[in-house]
Amino acid sequence: MTVDYKNTLNLPETSFPMRGDLAKREPDMLKNWYEKNLYQKIRKASKGKKSFILHDGPPYANGNIHIGHAVNKILKDIIIKSKTALGFDSPYIPGWDCHGLPIELKVEGLVGKPNEKISAAEFRQKCREYASEQVEGQKKDFIRLGVLGDWDNPYLTMNFDTEANIIRTLGKVIENGHLYKGSKPVHWCLDCGSSLAEAEVEYEDKVSPSIYVRFPVESADEIEAKFSAQGRGQGKLSAIIWTTTPWTMPSNRAIAVNADLEYNLVQLGDERVILAAELVESVAKAVGVEQVKILGSVKGADLELSRFHHPFYDFTVPVILGDHVTTDGGTGLVHTAPDHGLDDFIVGKQYDLPMAGLVSNDGKFISMTEFFAGKGVFEANPLVIEKLQEVGNLLKVEKIKHSYPHCWRHKTPIIFRATPQWFIGMETQGLRQQALGEIKQVRWIPDWGQARIEKMVENRPDWCISRQRTWGVPMTLFVHKETEELHPRTLDLLEEVAKRVERAGIQAWWDLDEKELLGADAETYRKVPDTLDVWFDSGSTYSSVVANRLEFNGQNIDMYLEGSDQHRGWFMSSLMLSTATDSKAPYKQVLTHGFTVDGQGRKMSKSIGNIVTPQEVMDKFGGDILRLWVASTDYTGEMTVSDEILKRAADSYRRIRNTARFLLANLNGFDPKRDLVKPEEMISLDRWAVACALDAQHEIKDAYDNYQFHTVVQRLMRFCSVEMGSFYLDIIKDRQYTTKASSLARRSCQTALWHIAEALVRWMAPILSFTADEIWQHLPQTESARAEFVFTEEFYQGLFGLGENEKLDDAYWQQLIKVRSEVNRVLEISRNNKEIGGGLEAEVTLYANDEYRALLEQLGNELRFVLITSKVDVKSLSEKPADLADSELEGITVSVTRSNAEKCPRCWHYSDKIGVNPEHPMLCPRCVENVVGNGEVRHFA
């Protein structure tokens, strides 16, 4: 009669599913988190702890989220959750940037331009409604990523209180003396009809005309005398400039040279020209002239204030000196149009050059522009060239492909154009130097971020903060109708307006009658019609949001975290404003991540068809796989994503999930309140496993603390796959399944598994949030009621290391791992040779040197459980048969033979003592002891 001993085994059992089925299961978990107020429970559990504030850089409220958004929000969420686990109070208030041109353009497409089909007030309301819809759409996707935060109370730059606080920030800028009004060239988008911030400019290749232009000399005698070239050479005499923007020629008001450069008077074919000495050869080659003769040389300084005729207008222009003139290209003489270039403007101010003012807001020449009235600037390029040819002042024309500024929204070329604007001065009150000093106080991650933003601050122009738009926070200023000076009560008036905006939003400004606030002064002062640059909106959130939200409790911001493009964007605008208002950087740490690219390193592009959307990833793989990919990728460089890479992340996920499932299945029936074994009473191997977890936890906590999330994933994988999966968990199966259910041998093992599970679930939670929550719900209850969610908990405190007097210390088990690896290698050879089936069918002899023998013999009969074979003999290396192949592990050689004993149907070990007990004729003595006796005793493994 065959007896079924299956019911005498402690087989693993758990309701924790093998398959994650994440795409299907995660939405229900999110619903549970929301219904049970998870975020508020985290806040309550963290109350009173040291704060860590990560301030959310607001994404723009327009369009669906893309993979870059997902990377950004997931990284932030990992930090917030890990800081909570590290013992911090770390609130997360998500935000959105809600004003600005992209929303205006969308709404224009829906309802028309303001003051045409719809009033400006109605238009603003439509913009507000559109932005609200976009926020809700993006919010759903961010929540779906598993990102925890105060989603019911996000900050929006269009919230009335935030709009009011942005105005108050402007007040502080004015109070500290950083604001001025000036006419200055700014980036101007013809399609936007507005100035652009530095961060809104992209550089793309553009084909432009490249022209060499003659400026005929006013007095040839004077120039000949300067060059000591009287009577030398022949033909007309000109200064030669080179430009790729012919349309700026009508605005030319000077020729700039470098005071320290050498300039030659050159016989170029049948004419005489002035060129920088270093560029004579290259210009001659460019214009196709072989006959060149130097007639004289002077320093640039000697040419100052010499006059030349404008190429096609009836006036002369001076030669001026400028340090911006180099010999990197061109002729060494620079066409200077103060309206259309920052260097031109700066040097022009030194010489009181007039501003031409020929180009209007729509990019067309005004009616008084001779030859080109009403023409668009780019339309005028061929017309200018034609005019230059007509008057004989075009030396050479060709096409050139070069990098040219474009509008980031319209992807169209922009121009520099002088307009009356409001600026934050970089030199006023020493703002530039102060900001550079503050940069050095900040921790930049990666550290190259510091040099990058330093260079940008060193070179950036004054910040033009005014815009000529409808949907934006107004510059709530009153200026004198004649002098343009600010009202003497500006700061008080700003606060009065801010209070009204707090109640009714920005429309309160547009509805305001000047007389309400100014009284009689309304006759001489007018409202400024401009709005603030949206970078002022987001750049002021350190004050408008963080300083005013109760959750932040007046604490300083610890971290800003955004893509690397934000060095010139949000990081820059925030730094400028915070330094201007509070004389300090707004952040202590700045972390930047790279952009996402496809498997071939290409940018995401509709035309290539390589766009990976977070929505598709979550529908196919689930949010946790997306989160694992983000965490396992080194974010300091480009972040590569593809279907193949995500599949690899899914494979890693399965290994982690399988480890967790093994732990839970083998904790079946374990009650920590009743069954927990004291560390000193545990089996040696179990103590080592817990100590192993403690080592891993130290490294994981350190990696989280230093934002090295790919290191966290690597350590997590090593722990699950190597230390646990291929060693400890493999070894303990026999003890778990075959010993008595309540024996010390089994409860010791379960105690270790319980400690490990409690630690593992917390390590995972910041990254694999959904899966960690699922594991948490399946863990055995503790003596004090288990918290409802893992996210309110700190890292596990119950792990312990090996004692100082531990005989079988970590070094011991590391040696055992090497031996086991070598035994497995030889067993695999025997399996492949069909000499054995599984390892339990083998009898192993280890020929070991004295060191290894002493090591192995400490385990006695339990060595076979570590090696997972039915029998192990340890002999001296000197007894090794001559024909036995050497091992790959020095000091030990392994011999494997097939066991001739019988297989025990209960434990599957082979034994020559099966049937010794007549009542259980099929069982080995060990199983008999475990079934009807007191149970086998284990000490080591």
From Swiss-Prot:
Binding site for ATP: 606
Compartments, as annotated in UniProt: Cytoplasm
UniProt: Zn(2+) binding residues: 904, 907, 924, 927
Catalysed conversion reaction: tRNA(Ile) + L-isoleucine + ATP = L-isoleucyl-tRNA(Ile) + AMP + diphosphate
Pfam family, one: Anticodon_1
Residues spanned by motif 'HIGH' region: 59-69
Cofactors demanded by this protein: Zn(2+)
Thylakoid is among the record's keywords: no
Alphabetized UniProt keyword annotations: Aminoacyl-tRNA synthetase, ATP-binding, Cytoplasm, Ligase, Metal-binding, Nucleotide-binding, Protein biosynthesis, Zinc
E.C. code: 6.1.1.5
Single GO term (MF): zinc ion binding
Organism superkingdom: Bacteria
Motif 'KMSKS' region location, chain numbering: 603-607
Any GO BP: isoleucyl-tRNA aminoacylation
Residues binding L-isoleucyl-5'-AMP: 562
GO cellular component: cytosol
SUPFAM superfamilies: Anticodon-binding domain of a subclass of class I aminoacyl-tRNA synthetases (SSF47323), Nucleotidylyl transferase (SSF52374), ValRS/IleRS/LeuRS editing domain (SSF50677)
Cofactor binding note from Swiss-Prot or TrEMBL: Binds 1 zinc ion per subunit.
Assembly and binders: Monomer.
Protein's job: Catalyzes the attachment of isoleucine to tRNA(Ile). As IleRS can inadvertently accommodate and process structurally similar amino acids such as valine, to avoid such errors it has two additional distinct tRNA(Ile)-dependent editing activities. One activity is designated as 'pretransfer' editing and involves the hydrolysis of activated Val-AMP. The other activity is designated 'posttransfer' editing and involves deacylation of mischarged Val-tRNA(Ile).
Family: Belongs to the class-I aminoacyl-tRNA synthetase family. IleS type 1 subfamily.
Record comment regarding domains: IleRS has two distinct active sites: one for aminoacylation and one for editing. The misactivated valine is translocated from the active site to the editing site, which sterically excludes the correctly activated isoleucine. The single editing site contains two valyl binding pockets, one specific for each substrate (Val-AMP or Val-tRNA(Ile)).
HAMAP family the record matches: Ile_tRNA_synth_type1
Protein name: Isoleucine--tRNA ligase
Gene: ileS
